[in-house]
Amino acid sequence: MGRSNSRSHSSRSKSRSQSSSRSRSRSHSRKKRYSSRSRSRTYSRSRSRDRIYSRDYRRDYRNNRGMRRPYGYRGRGRGYYQGGGGRYHRGGYRPVWNRRHSRSPRRGRSRSRSPKRRSVSSQRSRSRSRRSYRSSRSPRSSSSRSSSPYSKSPVSKRRGSQEKQTKKAEGEPQEESPLKSKSQEEPKDTFEHDPSESIDEFNKSATSGDIWPGLSAYDNSPRSPHSPSPIATPPSQSSSCSDAPMLSTVHSAKNTPSQHSHSIQHSPERSGSGSVGNGSSRYSPSQNSPIHHIPSRRSPAKTITPQNAPREESRGRSSFYPEGDQETAKTGKFLKRFTDEESRVFLLDRGNIRDKEAPKEKGSEKGRADGDWDDQEVLDYFSDKESAKQKFHDSEGDDTEETEDYRQFRKSVLADQGKSFATSSHRNTEEEGPKYKSKVSLKGNRESDGFREEKNYKLKETAYIVERPSTAKDKHKEEDKGSDRITVKKEVQSPEQVKSEKLKELFDYSPPLHKSLDAREKSIFREESPLRIKMIASDSHRPEVKLKMAPVPLDDSNRPASLTKDRLLASTLVHSVKKEQEFRSIFDHIKLPQANKSTSESFIQHIVSLVHHVKEQYFKSPAVTLNERFTSYQKATEEHSTRQKSPEIHRRIDISPSALRKHTRLAGEERGFKEEIQKGDKKLRCDSADLRHDIDRRRKERSKERGDSKGSRESSGSRKQEKTPKDYKEYKPYKDDSKHKGRERDHSRSSSSSASPSSPSSREEKESKKEREEEFKTHHEMKDYSGFAGVSRPRGTFFRIRGRGRARGVFAGTNTGPNNSNTTFQKRPKEEEWDPEYTPKSKKYFLHDDRDDGVDYWAKRGRGRGTFQRGRGRFNFKKSGSSPKWTHDKYQGDGIVEDDEETMENNEEKKDRRKEEKE
């Protein structure tokens, strides 16, 4: 933005000649910048080249032709000249004989080779705007041409004819007027390549589109042949398009140079060098920059006089904004790039124009000029700011307009040559002084007012620029109307009256948002460029902007009012009736205390009001207290856990006395478990979702169910006998002692091994013994055997895997016979099983170790620990303890291999269990 700032400063310079000279120098610098670029752009490079990708990522940059190497460009360390040196372009490999790509696409051939990345705004200025015609020819050109619809306003046609008159010598301008009319009729149909025309259309669309008030500035910009925006239909079109078609045309004719100068730098027109000269210089970076384009857009209307320029800018903007919607679609993508720079430059330039114009008008008409210019500046600021805002809104318009602007610049350069007379005439007009300006501005204002009235825009209508382009258009029109009206009134009224009326009208027709935004922007702009007017934005129910004129005592008189209004604002904000608008105005307001040096009290008031506003608007406390909220969570978790208690359909439901007993036990145990959890850690209870607890609880449930189901399955009386509550109690500790389980398993294996080989009856006997033993050791074994007792199935001798220990599980799956482990688990009372005292941590937390449920664990693991006893009284497999001997014995007894069917069923059961566990 340095460039744009310098531009703005130059335009700020009071003397037009000065600004013209500056603009000229600036334009030269920009020319340097862009000349190479234009050259490089003559061949339209691939889109990627136009983008600033670092070379390494660009497709055909160097070695990466067609393929991006996974590694960054790795110099030349690997070939012959390993230094790689700068032999060719650094890589030593010249992919293409002409290495255009060594330069980043944005730099073009001219600039230093360092990959200058431009700021968004500078990139845009980079010449989307300057070269807008060229870029328009590129994909952008379509947008710019499509922007020809922007020249929808009749004025655009008028101006098109004017430009044709001036440009018909140029030929392109002729296209422009038809294109303008076309674009008016077919916004997107005409993508004619006439840069001037496209630019005019852009200007129109920008004017109507609210997007780029400054696009007309582009037109006016020295490069855009429309730099004499009058010819460049877009500026006048834009202004006339929305507000004062005739006015724009008149202004275009009168102010063609003026428009150039208005292309944000009045300097070009003021400098008085021929429009052509100014055209080139006008196409200076500042003018070409979107902001400058904005002024030139306005300048069609503005061009009439610097005085009118702001109003007409506003008008042009409003006209832009009305068309902005159409423009928006096209230019939206380009807008973003330019919006930042343009908004800044545009505001600065406008400020500069106003400063320049204000001194002129003030010098000639000090009486009226003081109040008038300040007011007008304020109005212009409002309109300009709003238009600038709308520019932001219609992001598309900007680029398209820029593109077209560049085209127009070229036409405009030609037109400028033809229009030098216009420049001189405009210069004469300016020299004629505020009189002529005021006349023109009055005329332009009246025209624009008439145009607005034709459009039935009411000043009182509150449309928020921020909200949407159409609203912004209406607003801008209203604003322009208001500003024009005020301008007319200014001549009639004393400056103070004018000011007051202006403020009233401005604020009446512009919504609080406009006011606040304008006020903010004004204050910001004034801070940047010292304008004589200072805004005291005091927000009452509706933000009011007061212009603080240093010479005028308005300031002091307004200060108390502003403070009271601040208080009102604070209260209103607290009530949060006015939301965004006032919130924005508050920010302006906060800036005010510093600007106005208001008391700390007012500042505090602002801050308090802000805090309240933010709190109410953005941090509304929920109706539910934290306690209630978390209580609800806890309740939900409890309900969830209770729900889970209910038998799950996918599980096999054993309907057997053991199952019923188990169920009752399960319910009691769960109650106990819940109580424990609640006592110990409500957090965990809240988190029944907590994985560990959930898993543990489920495991318990399963093991209990298994125990019960297994008990039922272990149909043999031995199991039932031993499964008396006593047994459960006995086994409970053991089951709970999953840590003991390993040992228990070993014992159970040994015992089970003896038991398993034995017939079911012997097994049952043994099981009873074992169960007694297991009172210390392994109900696993008992369960396993009890399972078998009912069915003396060979315990998968099939697996005589001696070393298998736990790992035996794989075969254990087939080993459905040894349901021992599951059986064991079943036997343990569930309450006992999970008694935290006994439960070893390893069991609880080790892989959610289902060592109790080893069956589940291993079944999950596909280890085939016969988990499936559920259906058909299958035997629970004893979890393979670690004793290979036991496995050996166990399987030995049954020399028979279990049926494949059983294996399959075991697998099925495993699957079921897995499902259960997952759930």
Swiss-Prot record:
Q: Which residues carry this modification: Omega-N-methylarginine?
A: R808
In the record, Citrulline modifications are located at R802
Q: Modified after translation how?
A: Citrullinated by PADI4.
Q: Major location, coarse class? A: cytoplasm
Phosphoserine, modified sites:
102, 104, 177, 181, 196, 198, 221, 258, 261, 263, 267, 284, 289, 296, 299, 314, 383, 387, 395, 420, 425, 448, 470, 494, 500, 510, 523, 529, 557, 562, 576, 646, 656, 658, 688, 759
Q: For the region Disordered, what residue ranges are annotated?
A: 1-454, 468-499, 670-793, 809-839, 861-919
Modified positions (N6-acetyllysine) are K152, K330, K419, K435, K473
Q: Where is this cross-link: Glycyl lysine isopeptide (Lys-Gly) (interchain with G-Cter in SUMO1)?
A: K578, K830
- Keyword Transcription regulation recorded: yes
UniProt protein name: Bcl-2-associated transcription factor 1
Q: Which organism is it from?
A: Mus musculus (Mouse)
> Gene for this protein?
Bclaf1
